[in-house]
Each structure stands twice: as structure tokens, then as C-alpha cells.
Regions:
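Short beta->alpha connector loops
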Residues: 23-24, 43-47, 67-70, 125-128
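Active-site environment of divalent metal-dependent phosphoester hydrolases
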Residues: 46-48, 69-73, 93-97, 150-152, ...
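Short His-Asn-centered micro-motif
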Residues: 40-43, 64-68, 88-90, 123, ...
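Active-site HxH/HxHxD metal-binding segment of metal-dependent hydrolases
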Residues: 51-114
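Metallo-beta-lactamase
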Residues: 2-9, 15, 36-42, 87-220
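Pre-active-site segment of Zn-dependent metallo-hydrolases
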Residues: 19, 30-62
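Short, hydrophobic/aromatic-rich segments at coil-to-beta transitions
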Residues: 12-19, 115-120
Length: 221
């Protein structure tokens, strides 16, 4: 049976990745090894419609706060899915615990449930505890990122090719710009992304995306 969702839309050409938007903010749902769903950066305000659409996709087992600023939807989604694991990086934990009053676990249990083609990335040089997902899928390399990159908004199902830097990111997200830039360029040299799904703005896809990201960081950081 083909999976359908009125709120979470399948990413074109990529199995197991679904995105939902409210305004300029995006939540990404990803299917784990046990067929349950990970929510990357739950977005406040999606409400009952999001919960109903997720029930079509599968049980939600993990709610990932991908940095310490992306926390406004966590309480709402934890009420929806009280059996889900709330997880974050150790760097993000202090502020998340203070702001949300929720109890978070580490990333180990989530990592153990990731498909073989997927890994968590924790960029060097940032101060927010940002966590990315890297997925290899049918020739595509997908990065799911939080505040590091953005793009002009697009319609559902469409892509854009020009990466941008979120205006607040250099001041509030970056601890050491050279360290972060070097880390990103090293990752690109190892396995360049062809798709970037940011939490803000449009989804990026192009053949030279890695080079575009590198050039952007060299110009702006």
C-alpha cells in the first residue's frame, strides 16, 4: 500500500523521508530500522493534523531536538507521543532541560535504530549542540540540518539550488568559524551532499551542492 500523508509529504525520489512545514519552519520525519518514525525538530503549531498524518506513516519512537534553540514544539509532540524518546546532544542538553523542563536521553539509542545508510553528524565549531542526519539513498546524499544552512522558500515538492546562511547563525550558532568551515569541507570531500533539508526555507538539490556550500561558508564566515 502506498504511503500517503496530508501533512508530512514524501521527499521526491527518496524513500523514508517526509517533511512538513508551518510558515518557514520544517519538521522532517524519517523511518528508522524498526519501521518507527524519528521526528527531527518537531515544529509547534502543526497540531492534530500532523498527528493524524503521522499515524499513517507509523509509530513515532524518537523526538530529536537538533540543537538547543529548536525546542518550542517538544512539549506539544511529547503529549502526542508520550512513549517516544526525547533525545539531544550533550551540548544541547543543559539549555533544553532548563527551558523545557523535559527529560532528555542521549543519542545512543537512536543511533542503534538508524538504518545502515544513515548516520548522525555533530559538526565541530558550533555552540548549540547541533546534530545533522546524513542519509545515502539511491545515489543521493542527504543532509538534514538545523540552522547551519537555509534557502529561499519553495512550494511542496520543489527544490532550489542556491544555499544561504541563516542571518542569526554566525552570531548565535558558531563558536569557531574556521573549525566549523574546515569540518564541513572535510565532510564534503569525503561524501558531498546532493540534497540539503534545512529547518528553515526551501530544500536544496543540485549536482554541485557541496561546492556551493563550501563557497558560501568561505564568503560569510
Amino acid at each position: 500500500m502506498k504511503e500517503k500523508s496530508p501533512i508530512f509529504h514524501a521527499l521526491t525520489g527518496v524513500k523514508g523521508v517526509y517533511t512538513a512545514q508551518t510558515g518557514k519552519l520544517r519538521c522532517t520525519a524519517y523511518r528508522l530500522s524498526d519501521r518507527s518514525m524519528l521526528l527531527y525538530s518537531p515544529v509547534a503549531g502543526l497540531g492534530d493534523a500532523a498527528r493524524e498524518s503521522l499515524s499513517i506513516l507509523g509509530d513515532v519512537s524518537n523526538l530529536l531536538a537538533p540543537n538547543h534553540y529548536h525546542n518550542k514544539g517538544l512539549a506539544e509532540y511529547f503529549r502526542f507521543f508520550p512513549n517516544a524518546n526525547l533525545v539531544c546532544s550533550t551540548t544541547a542538553l543543559p539549555r533544553l532541560s532548563k527551558i523545557t523542563k523535559l527529560k532528555f536521553g542521549g543519542l545512543g539509542s537512536l543511533e542503534n535504530n538508524l538504518p545502515d545508510n544513515t548516520e548522525l553528524l555533530e559538526p565541530d565549531g558550533l555552540k548549540t549542540g547541533e546534530i545533522w542526519l546524513q542519509i545515502k539513498n539511491k545515489g543521493e546524499v542527504i543532509w538534514i540540518v538545523t540552522d547551519a544552512f537555509t534557502a529561499q522558500p519553495t512550494a511542496v515538492g520543489e527544490f532550489t539550488q542556491e544555499p544561504l546562511l541563516l542571518g542569526t547563525f554566525p552570531r548565535y550558532g558558531v563558536r569557531d568559524s574556521e573549525l566549523f568551515r574546515t569540518w564541513v569541507e572535510t565532510k564534503i570531500s569525503e561524501l558531498a551532499p546532493t540534497i540539503v533539508i534545512p529547518c528553515h526555507g526551501g530544500i536544496l538539490k543540485c549536482d554541485n551542492l557541496g561546492k556551493s556550500l563550501s563557497n558560501l561558508l568561505r564568503k560569510t564566515l
